[in-house]
Amino acid sequence: MAQNKIEKSEEDWKSVLTPEQYHVLRQKGTERPFSGNLYYNKEKGIYTCAACGQELFSSDTKFESGTGWPSFYDVISSDRVRLHEDNSYFMKRIEVVCSRCGSHLGHVFEDGPEPTGQRYCINSVSLGFTKEEDTGKEKE
């Protein structure tokens, strides 16, 4: 279940986000491809919204799309994101925003792998990452 909504003024967002995060998350910017630190991340864990911390994606659904941005074929739960039509830059796309704080995450396309056929193409700077803790148990 999605967490309670967070509402802040743009000045409040500016005070808690880096300039690059603010540009992407609040002004719907896009980071340069292959520049984000989480694009190359191969660790197991949970990807969260960088603005509010809501859990969004599992590393189990991350895949290499070759686009230069972290790509996932599914969200943790459909109530974690909202989808909006985006016709900017003379393109027809579907924007993905965090359902908790309304921050821009990226876009979703219908060219992903099975089982969903979707590719959530997400700006690395829009994400946080919580590494899966090693439980010390041996795999069976």
Swiss-Prot record:
Say yes or no: keyword ATP-binding present. Answer: no
Leader sequence range is none
Specify the superkingdom: Archaea
Q: Which GO terms describe its cellular component?
A: cytoplasm
Q: Which residues constitute the catalytic centre?
A: C121 (nucleophile)
* Annotated keywords: Metal-binding, Oxidoreductase, Zinc
Enzyme group, top EC level? oxidoreductase
Q: Which cofactor does it need?
A: Zn(2+)
Instruction: Provide the MsrB domain boundaries.
Output: 10-132
Catalyses:
L-methionyl-[protein] + [thioredoxin]-disulfide + H2O = L-methionyl-(R)-S-oxide-[protein] + [thioredoxin]-dithiol
Cited InterPro entries? Met_Sox_Rdtase_MsrB (IPR028427), Met_Sox_Rdtase_MsrB_dom (IPR002579), Mss4-like_sf (IPR011057)
Q: Which residues bind Zn(2+)?
A: C49, C52, C98, C101
| Cofactor details (free text) | Binds 1 zinc ion per subunit. The zinc ion is important for the structural integrity of the protein.
Pfam families in the record, alphabetically?
SelR (PF01641)
The GO annotation for biological process reads: protein repair; response to oxidative stress
Report the EC number(s), separated by commas if there are several.
1.8.4.12
Q: Extract the GO molecular function terms from the UniProt entry.
A: peptide-methionine (R)-S-oxide reductase activity; zinc ion binding
Family matches, as HAMAP family = MsrB
Q: Which family does it belong to?
A: Belongs to the MsrB Met sulfoxide reductase family.
- What is the name of the protein in this document? Peptide methionine sulfoxide reductase MsrB
**Organism encoding this protein:** Methanosarcina mazei (strain ATCC BAA-159 / DSM 3647 / Goe1 / Go1 / JCM 11833 / OCM 88) (Methanosarcina frisia)
Per the UniProt record, the lineage of the source organism begins with:
Archaea, Methanobacteriati, Methanobacteriota, Stenosarchaea group, Methanomicrobia
Whichever gene encodes this chain, its name is: msrB
